[in-house]
């Protein structure tokens, strides 16, 4: 019987709709800008070469990524008519040695990056892009897993409004679930503990030099419910097999 080499690669990718943070007028002070939106974001790891979002087809992967959009299209807030809002970064905390980065539309590398522990104001980015008040194709990335706490504020480049109150968003650069594997005769047995509200594909590759990963059809679109998922894959005729788990929303 031939020896069979099987190796696990665990990777994560998100293809979901994204959240928004509104930039508008503060309801308690009509002369001040305000930020309204989620305080928590999940940043899943996107392997190199894997798709992340239809809005970022050029994204190369290799980072924990989150597609959070700042917009002047308001619902919870009143619009800040006549303003040209820009988002400043007030502070960044997170894993030691980690970087928090912003990707502008069309970027193939970070537009700017700040190390964790950043203590002061940074210019950030304009909310409107070429007149588009709802700019798609931007992303935030983190290069190490862990919890990042980023504080933002909105300022008006035309000085018609005072800067907003600071808003802190927690980004969880989530490690993928561990994939356990064992050999049972001519089959590889794999299992992992899924996460609720996330989905999974098990992919296989027989030659890493090719860079070609293929979904195992019977183990695709697995719905996570916080339970243990058990899978098998026949390895007959394949002396070398590599597996990776793709997690997405």
Task: Describe each PLM feature range.
Residues 18-137, 153, 158-176:
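Contiguous segments within soluble domain cores/interaction surfaces
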Residues 138-143, 233-235:
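Short, hydrophobic beta-strand segments
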Residues 136, 144-148, 152, 198, ...:
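Short tyrosine-centred short linear motifs in exposed loops/low-complexity segments
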Residues 138, 150, 167-169, 190, ...:
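Hydrophobic residues positioned within well-ordered beta-strands of beta-sheet architectures
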């Amino acid at each position: 019987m031939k020896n069979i080499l099987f190796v696990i690669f665990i990777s994560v990718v998100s293809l979901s709709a994204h959240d928004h943070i509104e930039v508008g007028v503060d309801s308690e002070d009509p002369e001040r800008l305000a930020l309204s939106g989620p305080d928590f974001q999940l940043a899943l790891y996107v392997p190199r070469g894997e798709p992340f979002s239809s809005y970022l087809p050029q994204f190369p992967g290799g980072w924990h990524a989150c597609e959070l959009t700042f917009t002047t299209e308001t619902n919870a807030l009143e619009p800040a008519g006549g303003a040209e809002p820009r988002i400043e970064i007030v502070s960044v905390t997170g894993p030691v040695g980690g970087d928090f980065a912003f990707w502008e539309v069309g970027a193939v590398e970070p537009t700017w990056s700040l190390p964790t522990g950043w203590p002061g104001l940074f210019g950030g980015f304009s909310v409107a892009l070429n007149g588009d008040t709802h700019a798609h194709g931007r992303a935030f990335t983190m290069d190490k897993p862990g919890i990042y706490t980023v504080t933002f504020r909105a300022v008006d480049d035309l000085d018609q409004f005072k800067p907003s109150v600071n808003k802190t968003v927690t980004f969880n650069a989530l490690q993928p679930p561990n994939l356990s594997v064992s050999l049972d005769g001519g089959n590889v047995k794999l299992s992992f503990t899924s996460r609720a509200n996330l989905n999974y594909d098990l992919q296989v590759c027989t030659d890493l030099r090719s860079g070609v990963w293929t979904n195992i059809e019977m183990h695709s679109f697995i719905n996570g419910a916080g339970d243990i998922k058990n899978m098998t894959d026949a390895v007959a005729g394949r002396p070398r097999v590599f597996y990776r788990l793709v997690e997405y929303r």
